[in-house]
């Protein structure tokens, strides 16, 4: 009898709810009655049929009118409250056409006769009691992106909207500033396809957005609509852990009160399940299936497949066989050609012929759970065909590698320290200086992490990592970094393998020496006797003749074999490169991008697993991978003389870290997760990712190599020397333009800069580990790089950047370093480049960059702070030692004996060294006069810089007094002017630091350079 009583109790509330519902329905009907009829609105339109023959109903209905490219769509009747994906692609008219350009999670919400497109708040949630949920909902509201009018109510009861007005008129809202419809009158409906789970719509537009040359460019923009699936499909999210690198889906749960519980992070991964859970090794219920687009060259497809298949081995370790399946589109047979690469139901590997070295593996992720729903891989051919090294583009990037936001802020106010300015062509220097000064005023000094635009992927270093709940691979530079290595290979394949040739010559000489020694021993053991000696001499003569004939025959055989080998090699070239060389490089790159689609982030510590000798050894070659992961930017392993054999040029499989990461992300044994993570201290499982590359850890770097990078850097410099010796006679062939000599030299200068920049990161460095308390070994999370390693790195930078001989310049080479004079854009900036190479500007650009690496405030602060991290009785590289070492290297001529026979053609201090010295002096002045209080280290830095300047003036005085009469005019004038500027600057500096208002007077006294 109690139930009816309760029913009576709640009857008034129920009646009120029903009444409200009826009133809402009536109001909706009234609004619908005010709208035009659907028949009138859809007049002249034809419905787009569902493309799937096995289904009769699409995600929503679409009608098109071909004559004027009009498109209308009817949303589902039950659209309210549902989340939808809108995935974006610029599918033509762009160098990165086909690259997934980001996505939006949206809701439609009706307001009278208009529909608002809403970006729901997904970042802040409450999973606890009803009160906390209500509070969060009230405080953290959704965002209105745009609104459109309702044209009519459709035949299925849903609102009808103007799709072309939405997608063309608001293109910038979706794609960001890179897409702006500059002429709305010129557009065309490219395609409209309706599927059961998605709708695909593409328009040709005139784009006048950012980075578009001229008033407009025809492009195709593609929209993919799909419903965000429910969370009731059996997928179980997995917590992220900073010791293993996965992209994450993150939100704040404000119903929790512990710090560790408030921020919820799930790894992004696929929903893989065993078909038969009883089997230790079972096929998946639904594999990850990739389709290779028909545009991928047939000659490369087996290597694409190899890169994908690498990962199946890792999934077998967790009990899934054939977790990833690969299929091929084929235009000739029509196989899979009905599948649209933009269709979100299919995962595609796409190939772009855009002459740009890049690759990317973005994915679409459930915003609540981190489940990966679909993914694509875009490969380009530019890195393979890359032969034209662009000095102005790549050199500054190499020089800026590892710079932090702190350093960028400093460079913005000190442009003479900025490698991007110093390496710029003279005609662009002022523009670059102003540009970077503006960037320095932005958050984090214009650091890419702060400026990444989530609306469009592929144009910023940290794309995909910020701006949305779920991270994804928004930009990958693995292929771009490999472009420089391939450019070396394309200098001349014979040059690339010259190290093997040199090793072969050395081995031949060693064998000959051994044979000579054996012959001497044999002669000594002969019996005495004139007759026997005569017989032996005659026999030896005959033998010598026979040997000469044999040598001639052997030489001919070797020549024939070389010719046969060359012919055989030519038969297996892929676009001018041996298949055995470039094929594994492509497989390595594909494996890297597949790793991203599986949820894995970069691991920039992976290349530091083995020493260079271990990598180039028979024990490792073909048996183990050269790095612990394919998720690093590992350079091509060009050997000169390290180890006992040329090791693998690239990764030949996924590495031990990759197996471990897949085990953590995809194992079915949740109880094993802590045990899996506890292995994080093992050498092959070390991890650092994108945001770590600007920190103090020298092993967390892109493009470095080996456990002992100093050995790698020295090896690179040997290759540089070898290449430079062969530029004129080997690289530039008969009939070639002499512009190749310049390009060849600038390639070597790029490699030299890369090696020096890599080693500069070790100065002031500290190894950083992601261990947690209780992990094996009890390592401290921060461990200062041993002082001896820092000193060795410092010496390498000095030797490779400060001295003339490091650059290998000769009059014969310089007079042939011309330029190709074409105005058609065939070579970058060639029409504006002088035929005479700007020797001093180019070399000073590298020298100035080296000084910036070693003397920028961030590096000096790290050295200063490291002194306190170590016990006083432990060896450390100190700030005074660093500055004194640089000073001694830059001004070494002052300590030498007075020169004999010097004149203006043979100066005591060369022109390149005078430039370096003037630059160094100015850097010390900048540090002395710096008044910023950004860091507590500025004062001791300033004091020590002042002391170095005082020491320098004393050394200059002593040198002028001792050797002044024997100095050439260049050197004497240089030293005299340097001393005068230091004295005046230090005197003015006291006034400047006492009252900054005196700065104009200081500038007047010091001249333009002091600004």
Language model features with spans:
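Sec/Tat signal peptide C-region and signal peptidase I cleavage site
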Residues: 28-32
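Zn2+-dependent metallopeptidase catalytic core
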Residues: 80, 299-323
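Auxiliary tRNA-acceptor-end handling modules of aminoacyl-tRNA synthetases
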Residues: 33-296, 314, 318, 329-514, ...
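Bacterial N-terminal signal peptides
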Residues: 15-26
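Soluble non-cytosolic domains of exported or imported proteins
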Residues: 261, 294, 298-306, 580-585, ...
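The catalytic-center signature of Zn2+-dependent metalloproteases
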Residues: 317, 327-355, 584-591, 596-640
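Bacterial N-terminal signal peptides that target proteins for export
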Residues: 2-17
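Conserved catalytic/binding loops enriched for acidic/polar residues
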Residues: 457, 461-467, 471-475, 483, ...
């Amino acid at each position: 009898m109690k139930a009816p009583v309760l029913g009576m109790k709640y009857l008034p509330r129920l009646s009120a709810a029903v009444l409200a519902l009826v009133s809402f329905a009536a109001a909706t009907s009234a609004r619908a009655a005010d709208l035009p009829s659907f028949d009138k609105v859809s007049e002249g339109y034809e419905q787009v049929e569902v493309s799937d023959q096995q289904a009769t109903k699409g995600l929503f209905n679409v009608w098109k009118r071909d004559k004027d490219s009009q498109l209308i769509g009817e949303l589902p009747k039950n659209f309210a409250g549902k989340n939808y994906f809108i995935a974006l692609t610029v599918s033509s008219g762009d160098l990165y056409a086909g690259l997934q350009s980001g996505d939006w999670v949206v809701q439609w919400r009706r307001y009278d006769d208009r529909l608002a497109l809403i970006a729901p708040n997904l970042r802040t949630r409450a999973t606890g009691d009803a009160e906390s949920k209500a509070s969060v909902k009230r405080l953290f509201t959704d965002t209105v992106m745009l609104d459109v009018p309702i044209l009519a109510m459709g035949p299925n009861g849903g609102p009808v909207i103007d799709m072309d007005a939405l997608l063309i008129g608001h293109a910038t809202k979706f794609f960001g500033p890179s897409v702006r419809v500059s002429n709305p009158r010129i557009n065309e409906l490219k395609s409209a396809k309706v599927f059961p789970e998605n709708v695909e719509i593409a328009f040709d537009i005139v784009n006048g957005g950012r980075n578009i040359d001229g008033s407009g460019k025809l492009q195709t923009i593609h929209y993919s609509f799909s419903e965000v699936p429910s969370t009731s499909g059996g997928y179980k999210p997995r917590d992220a852990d900073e010791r293993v690198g996965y992209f994450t889906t993150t939100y704040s749960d404000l119903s929790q009160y512990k710090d560790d519980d408030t921020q919820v992070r799930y790894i992004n991964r696929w929903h893989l399940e065993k078909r038969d859970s009883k089997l230790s090794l079972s096929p998946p219920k639904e594999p990850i299936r990739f389709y290779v687009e028909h545009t991928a060259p047939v000659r490369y497809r087996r290597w694409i497949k190899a890169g994908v298949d690498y990962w199946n081995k890792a999934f077998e370790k967790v009990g899934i066989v054939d977790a990833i399946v690969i299929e091929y589109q084929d235009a000739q047979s029509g196989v899979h050609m009905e599948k649209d690469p933009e269709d979100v139901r299919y995962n595609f590997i796409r190939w772009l012929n855009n002459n740009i070295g890049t690759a990317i593996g973005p994915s679409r992720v459930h915003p609540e759970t981190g489940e990966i729903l679909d993914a694509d891989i875009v490969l380009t051919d530019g890195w393979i065909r890359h032969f034209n090294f662009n000095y102005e583009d790549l050199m500054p990037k190499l020089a800026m590698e590892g710079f932090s936001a702190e350093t960028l802020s400093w460079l913005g106010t000190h442009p003479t320290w900025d490698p991007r300015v110093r390496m710029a062509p003279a005609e662009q220097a002022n523009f670059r200086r102003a540009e970077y000064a503006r960037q320095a005023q932005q958050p984090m000094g214009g650091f890419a992490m702060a400026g990444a635009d989530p609306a469009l992927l592929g144009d910023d270093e940290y794309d995909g990592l910020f701006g949305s709940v779920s991270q994804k691979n928004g930009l990958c530079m693995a292929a771009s970094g490999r472009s420089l290595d391939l450019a070396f290979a394309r200098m001349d394949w014979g040059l690339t393998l010259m190290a093997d040739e040199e090793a072969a010559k050395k081995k031949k000489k060693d064998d000959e020496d051994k044979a000579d020694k054996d012959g001497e021993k044999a002669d000594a053991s002969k019996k005495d006797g004139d007759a026997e000696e005569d017989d032996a001499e005659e026999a030896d003569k005959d033998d010598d003749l026979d040997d000469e004939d044999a040598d001639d025959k052997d030489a001919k055989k070797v020549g024939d074999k070389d010719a046969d080998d060359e012919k055989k090699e030519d038969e297996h070239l892929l676009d001018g490169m041996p298949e055995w060389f470039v094929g594994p490089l492509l497989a390595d790159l594909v494996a890297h991008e597949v790793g991203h689609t599986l949820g894995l982030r970069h691991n920039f510590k992976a290349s530091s697993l083995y020493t260079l000798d271990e990598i180039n050894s028979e024990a490792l070659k073909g048996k183990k991978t050269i790095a612990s992961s394919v998720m690093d930017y590992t350079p091509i392993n060009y050997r000169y003389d390290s180890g006992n054999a040329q090791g693998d040029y690239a990764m030949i499989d996924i590495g031990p870290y990759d197996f471990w990461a897949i085990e953590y992300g995809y194992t079915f044994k949740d109880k094993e997760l802590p045990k899996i993570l506890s292995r994080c201290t093992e050498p092959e499982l070390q991890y650092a990712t994108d945001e770590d590359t600007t920190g103090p850890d020298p092993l967390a770097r892109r493009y470095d190599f080996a456990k002992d990078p100093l050995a790698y850097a020295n090896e690179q410099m040997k290759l540089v020397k070898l290449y430079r010796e062969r530029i004129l006679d080997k690289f530039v062939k008969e009939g070639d333009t002499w512009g190749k000599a310049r390009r060849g030299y600038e390639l070597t200068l790029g490699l030299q800069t890369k090696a020096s920049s890599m080693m500069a990161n070790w100065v002031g460095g500290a190894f950083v580990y992601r261990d947690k308390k209780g992990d094996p070994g009890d390592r401290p999370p921060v461990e200062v790089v041993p002082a001896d390693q820092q000193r060795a790195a410092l010496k390498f930078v000095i030797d490779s950047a400060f001295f003339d001989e490091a650059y290998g310049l000769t009059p014969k080479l310089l007079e042939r370093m011309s330029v190709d004079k074409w105005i058609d854009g065939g070579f970058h900036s060639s029409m504006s480049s002088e035929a005479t190479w700007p020797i001093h500007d180019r070399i000073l650009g590298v020298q100035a960059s080296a000084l910036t690496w070693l003397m920028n405030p961030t590096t000096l602060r790290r050295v200063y702070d490291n002194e306190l991290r170590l016990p006083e009785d432990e060896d450390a590289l100190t700030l005074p030692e660093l500055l004194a070492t640089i000073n001694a290297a830059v001004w070494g001529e002052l300590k030498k004996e007075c020169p004999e026979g010097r004149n203006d053609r043979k100066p005591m201090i060369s022109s390149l060294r005078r430039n370096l010295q003037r630059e160094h002096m100015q850097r010390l002045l900048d540090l002395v006069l710096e008044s910023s209080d950004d860091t507590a280290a500025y004062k001791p830095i300033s004091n020590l810089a002042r002391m170095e300047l005082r020491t320098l003036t004393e050394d200059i005085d002593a040198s002028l007094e001792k050797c002044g009469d024997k100095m050439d005019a260049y050197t004497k004038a240089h030293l005299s002017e340097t001393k005068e500027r230091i004295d005046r600057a230090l005197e003015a500096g006291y006034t400047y630091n006492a009252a900054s208002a005196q700065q104009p007077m200081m500038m007047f006294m010091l001249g333009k350079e002091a600004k």
